[in-house]
């Protein structure tokens, strides 16, 4: 599973570099703003149904109450589907403002509307992902990620070879987003009858935990997600709003490089959180402390090693032309991207710390 996820993340990292070289700094910034704008509208209205499913379905399964688990999944799917429709409606209303004030180009409004279709394709993806995590189908998740990465890679490489523009790249990412959205839904619908029994969707809502408790959890996670959107996940949008897509392109480049740092740790996030939930539900505190200590040591060691390498050799490796043993001159990013380097060093501080204690992020 980890190998699938690692390959998928590696492909995504390479695609980011290829896309940056194809579009240039400003075009790369516009791409980041459009994708970020749509994603953040969705996050603002998201109740993080995946976390709710992992918590309450996981508890019900641990207590051998499959009917209650089915009621949780059913309710989560309904709520998430409704909020996805609302999110797309809000996006339609906000798209002209986003194009005018953030991208600073009204002609990009159709691009926002186009990529916004991904919100509809992810109508119950969070719920489905939570189901796959609770039922330990990590291989299915990893395989979906790999397929999505390969399809997106093929489309972007085609765009690069044919010298296509921003629209072709955006469509490539949209197709990938639809795969990553619909894939978990299809797989979870396959496994749910086998785990919860046929007719699981008929489980009455009366089996749900206390409505106030569920609503409180959903609202608190939505509030937490909203804070993250404003303070952490909207950096490219803020840069575009206060400066221009050019500066947003520099910032997005720095973020893309940072993603290389956290790439090997990403698989730990989706696999560790369900284990934490199970240990907490069972009160196995010694195992929980041991698990957190182990994953923190692994994440911290990797982060420190990569950070030192970037500080010492980042400018030479990333933004300078260098000649490997095959005799061809290779340059990862053109020199026009060099202003992203100081941003990268600043981001290393915060992301390095967050990367070390990554297990605390979804809680």
Identify the residue ranges that each predicted region occupies:
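Interfacial transmembrane-helix starts/ends
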Residues: 32, 53, 57, 66-82, ...
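Helix-loop junctions and terminal segments of transmembrane helices
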Residues: 46-63, 133-134, 197, 254, ...
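Helix-terminus/linker motif at the lipid-water interface of multi-pass membrane proteins
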Residues: 13-27, 99-102, 160, 229-260, ...
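Hydrophobic alpha-helical transmembrane segments
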Residues: 33, 109, 113, 143-199
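Alpha-helical transmembrane segments of polytopic membrane transporters and translocases
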Residues: 18, 29-46, 75-79, 178-179, ...
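Interhelical loop/hinge segments that connect adjacent transmembrane helices in multipass membrane
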Residues: 184-232, 275, 283-287
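Alpha-helical transmembrane segments of multi-pass membrane proteins
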Residues: 89, 93, 97-100, 104-128, ...
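Signature of the first transmembrane helix
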Residues: 1-58, 88-95, 118, 153, ...
